[in-house]
Amino acid sequence: VPQGSLREAVCYPNIDPHHPELAQALTLCRLEKLIDKLDEVGNWQQTLSPGELQRVAFARILLGKPKLILLDEATSALDEPTEAALYRLLRRQLPHSIIVSIGHRGTLAEFHDKSMYIARAGCAA
């Protein structure tokens, strides 16, 4: 997360800082308490908790609307109900996006159509 305003941090690297859906994305990602702080300048990497940083990443996804979403341990700092809510949110808001996740929790399987498990000896689809 770059230093500067929270608005710049949420919109990093290439989202319009005045995106009309910015407040809505934060609210959907359970970060509504940050809306009033968008123009505050600070070291947000240190100010926000690991879970908040992960939810900021989900807000970026909602704003950027990518066709391909790659998530590597993207919910490791979140509890399982919040993880489930965010994955459901992505599926609902971005139904045509491809989501590829890497994670250790078995709870991620329900949000994906296909799974691949990697073991020491190799992988199994």
Positions of predicted regions on the chain:
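Conserved catalytic segment of ABC-fold P-loop ATPases
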Residues: 98, 110-118
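Conserved signature/switch motifs of ABC ATPase nucleotide-binding domains
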Residues: 64, 95
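Catalytic Walker B motif of ABC-type/P-loop ATPase nucleotide-binding domains
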Residues: 69-73
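ABC-fold ATPase nucleotide-binding domain signature/coupling loops
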Residues: 2, 29-56, 60, 121
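ABC ATPase nucleotide-binding domain helical subdomain, centered on the C-loop/LSGGQ "ABC signature"
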Residues: 7-43, 87-88, 96
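Helix N-cap at the start of a conserved alpha-helix in ABC-type nucleotide-binding domains
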Residues: 80-81
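Short active-site loops of ABC-family nucleotide-binding domains
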Residues: 76-77
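Conserved H-loop
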Residues: 96-104
